[in-house]
């Protein structure tokens, strides 16, 4: 039987779709030997490699903005005093100028669900793409290229959106 590689894209909203694709591939018994992704695609790829479909499905069923980033309540609260669109834009702008959105909640979520040892022992390879701000170019890595104990750091770096606080490795 043929073996296949799976590539997941970045873009937060695509994440739940990608889990649906994974489910369909499992139901069709299509053998996956490698998964590559960037941003949310790298995060989902890690879940595929460790084989935890139910955990991934649960995350995507229950996830909220607060599970990903620490956002001022006024930005999300439709009833807040910052009711105008421009007030909200200005709050976001100030946050970005102040160093970016804090994604500690996402890091905490990954630490609770990602099992680096399981991923490293899996016969399925994991590839991810992140970006070097020093060299100003993409960095492509497979799990064997990532120093032990730093997989979550690299996943966070891959998921780093320009409005987020940068993840330095």
Language model regions located:
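Patatin-like phospholipase
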Residues: 1-38, 46-169
